[in-house]
């Protein structure tokens, strides 16, 4: 039935992502896929409908808008425009999104095949083009770590993604730069701001609306801990590849005021601070790296 899920633990649809939200705009969604053609009445009751013309591997979802909702089309169009190419960054089975509104705007978003740079690090490019707008081109450095239940069942991965900009006059070289905003991502952005200079993604348990997460849920705490360990691995990789510079350091959770004791992402602050103190991760003036506990900061005049 509609209420029964056969998806595995790591599936993006396990918690019904997106489906319940369609009832904001429709009372009778239709699904046409494979040999199935049905509508859903009263939220849970499937009813067979006439088969549509479509390719064998094509799925169609039809959402007849509520006739009394005069603002639905404008709201949906605004939602499409907010989507942006970044929506594809953490989706491993979707690499293209196209949308169009009759008599209105349109957009196309594409994700490149990831370029492997190490065992758990990739460079990913996403691009987007919307009607009347300049093309958007984003490059990301994405690190991942598989996560498991206490029974050792893999349930996806935690990821951290750093925004990349090309280094001027150095073809093929990239630098890490802080992002303007960093909402926690559970496949798609939530309303939870991380205060980080990079993006964090993982299979967090969310509220039914999927825009928030229970901060004291043990599973969510576990994922934050795994992300903290992954962040230190990323710092080491950036150092070894001569990318851990001042710009990259500005991405890290180093401001105690933003990560007070007991706050959700405080473990990332603690892990990065400990790593900087104990390991050679701080750039030296004369090249190379040194542990913060063994370094001195010169006055700005000398710098």
Question: What would you call each of these model-derived segments?
Answer:
Residues 1-42:
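Flexible ATP-lid and adjacent glycine-rich G1/G2 motifs of the Bergerat
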Residues 26-303:
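GHKL/Bergerat-fold ATPase module
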